Each structure stands twice: as structure tokens, then as C-alpha cells.
């Protein structure tokens, strides 16, 4: 199954906006995807380091084999996310 991993940190307004936009976009498209949320500190949290997270929010989509197929850094509109997610 495809996976969407969302990386954020505490007190991040852009992260809150992107999380909401992802939620709205996923509700608008028909895609079977596992969603994981990761909260931490850039450069200190192991999962952030292991996945080369340099900025938040960062959203990574992996295919059925666990290979990264999409990386979004920053905040994107619901419309853009619908377009991207509908092509998965």
C-alpha cells in the first residue's frame, strides 16, 4: 500500500495549514493510502535525519515497495494536492 508521511514540528503554523490541506485533498480523491504523521526536531529526531528532512512541513509519498515517489517541502493548496494525489 502507498504511504503518505507528513513531517512537522510543534508550533508550526505552516504545518497546521498543510495538514488541513492534505486532509481536505485526501477526502476529495479516491486513493488507497496509509497516512503517518511524524512530529520532531530537524537535525535531532532520528526519523527526520533518516529521511533527510531539512524543512517542515515536508510530505513524502512512497509507493507499494516503499520507494519515495513524491516529496513536497512547504505548504501547497488543496487544489494542487488533489491534482498530485489523484495521479498516484
Residue map of PLM features:
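Non-catalytic, surface beta->alpha helical segment in thiol-disulfide oxidoreductase systems
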Residues: 61-88
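Local sequence-structure signature of Cys/Sec-based thiol-disulfide redox active-site neighborhoods
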Residues: 1-31
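Short, glycine/charged-enriched secondary-structure capping and boundary segments
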Residues: 19-22, 50-53, 74-75
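Structural micro-motif
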Residues: 51-61
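A short beta-strand-loop structural module common to alpha/beta enzyme folds
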Residues: 31-41
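Alpha-helical elements of the RecA-like P-loop NTPase motor core of helicases
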Residues: 16, 20, 46, 70, ...
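Structural microenvironment flanking redox-active thiols in thiol-disulfide oxidoreductases
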Residues: 7-11, 40-47
Amino acid at each position: 500500500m502507498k504511504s503518505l508521511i507528513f513531517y512537522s514540528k510543534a508550533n508550526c503554523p505552516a504545518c497546521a495549514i498543510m495538514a488541513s490541506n492534505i486532509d481536505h485533498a485526501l477526502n476529495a480523491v479516491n486513493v488507497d493510502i496509509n497516512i503517518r504523521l511524524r512530529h520532531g526536531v530537524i537535525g535531532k529526531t532520528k526519523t527526520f535525519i533518516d529521511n533527510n528532512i531539512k524543512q517542515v512541513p515536508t510530505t513524502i509519498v512512497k509507493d507499494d515497495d516503499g520507494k519515495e515517489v513524491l516529496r513536497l517541502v512547504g505548504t501547497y493548496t488543496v487544489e494542487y494536492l488533489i491534482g498530485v494525489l489523484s495521479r498516484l
